[in-house]
Amino acid sequence: MGEFERRNGETDGKTGGETKKYFSYAAAADHSLKGRWGLVRGRTRWLAAGVLALGAVIGGVLWRLEESVSAAAPAPAGLEVRWIVDAGHGGEDGGAVSPGGMVESRINLEIARRVDGIFGFCGEPALMLRTEDISLHDPEAVTLREKKASDLHNRAQTASEYPEAALVSIHQNMFQQSRYRGTQVFYAPTQGSQELAQAIQGVVRESLQPENSRESKPIPSTVYLMNHIPNRAVLVECGFLSNPEEEGLLQDPKYQTKLAAVIAAGCLGGSSDLT
């Protein structure tokens, strides 16, 4: 379940032009933004195909990644970090739990690793905020609430050290009714975040989920991380753990790689227009 849902007590079971109880969505983009997005779409069509093919190769070797890296991975030495990959939740804060018992934080980490791997193969310096299924809280934090607050503060602090990098936060969705499915991208209030979210949402629809009619939407102010960093930032709800079919897909390594590939393609296809 996405961080914003748990804090608001509202889940994303609505699509298209529907609205939630706790916040309203932004109006449709103006003509200039639509024109800009059209250029991004044109480039991402071919880029998505290439990254999807690359993702298939990467998926076969990701399990060989070194397991001894620290929980909060250091920035690549001598390189300017362009992307920050955030696997949502972790440790005691597992996030949502599917009807079959699958914990969200583990799926988030698997997809985030793949996104990071694709960035690496494409020569895009990236930093993962966590590389293990643990919380990033300070040792002084004792209660679950203290640990969660400390964890989010530390993630925000790390991201803020690289203000020119864009943050991509990976989460999973949850709803009381099982029929809802599909990827949904939310964006931070910082400049360039909306365009980045639109690029990712567009590639998802064109390359992986043609039936997905969702549009990218603004993140509510209650989501701490996305509202306490200077970076361009998006939160990607990859799918619904409450949907039996999608629950199975989200646990499939091949599908995780496809998701990572379209997320990376959206980022890379739109990045030059967003800097």
Language model segments and positions:
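Catalytic-site microenvironment of enzymes
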Residues: 2-275
